[in-house]
Design a protein with these regions (language model features):
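Conserved nucleotide-sensing/catalytic segment adjacent to the nucleotide-binding pocket
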Residues: 89-126
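Conserved C-terminal guanine-recognition region of P-loop GTPase G domains, centered on the G4
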Residues: 118-186
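Canonical P-loop GTPase G-domain recognition
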Residues: 23-33, 167-212
Length: 212
């Protein structure tokens, strides 16, 4: 009896942490550059998309509570792989290279068009897309292209406005309303990675998508 209580007491802090943040144990799996290297089409995948400087990597780190999970490059556009992160068995986050790929070369940018098209058209595991946008510069043409891609394949998407601490509450609300009116998104969220605000709601939505 004592041993059982001892084991439960030692395990409780970790269980409690997972209850607070179910993304806490998210781990990097691998990166791919070609459609043929995609893993088996099973489980649930959430695609993370956004411009090179939208704060997507910082958001992923804040979402999971692991500041070292996604490497934050000092030169936006360096990442050229789709990186797979496993939240739990059968539930993955896919980090797409930032739009523009300004430092990756024109030929590399051309390669991603067919890859994304094939992924959206054929991937049964794709559950939803998070479209990260700097709240100060939302709905750029490249953002709208991603949104149109989601809508053309009937893939649910959620605009996530980053760096919300950089604007006033008035501008924050107006921007959320603008994005809501401009898109057919299921919801619009505002987050701040530096202040760690907005992530509790984002986690609940993602867990809801997993369990849907």
């Amino acid at each position: 009896m004592w041993l059982r209580r001892h084991i439960i007491c030692r395990a409780w802090p970790e269980i409690n942490d997972l209850m607070k943040n179910p993304f806490k144990n998210t781990a990097f799996l691998f990166g791919i550059t070609k459609h043929k290297n995609l893993p088996e089409d099973v489980g649930i995948e959430i695609l993370l998309s956004g411009r090179s400087n939208a704060g997507k990597s910082s958001a992923l780190n804040a979402l999971t509570g692991n500041k070292k999970l996604a490497r934050i490059s000092k030169t936006p556009g360096r990442t050229t792989e789709i990186n797979f992160f496993e939240v739990e068995d059968g539930f993955k986050l896919l980090d797409l290279p930032g739009y523009g790929f300004a430092k990756s070369g024109h030929s590399r940018r051309k390669d991603w068009g067919p890859l994304l098209g094939e992924y959206f058209e054929n991937r049964k595991a794709l559950e939803a897309v998070l479209v990260f946008m700097d709240i100060r510069h939302p709905l750029k043409p490249i953002d709208l292209e991603m949104i149109e891609l989601c809508e053309s394949f009937d893939v649910p998407y959620i605009p996530v406005l980053t760096k919300s601490d950089k604007v006033s509450k008035n501008i924050l609300m107006k921007t959320i309303q603008l994005v809501s009116k401009t898109t057919n998104a299921m919801e619009v969220l505002a987050i701040s990675s530096s202040k760690e605000t907005g992530f509790e709601k984002l986690r609940k939505i993602l867990i809801g998508l997993k369990n849907d």
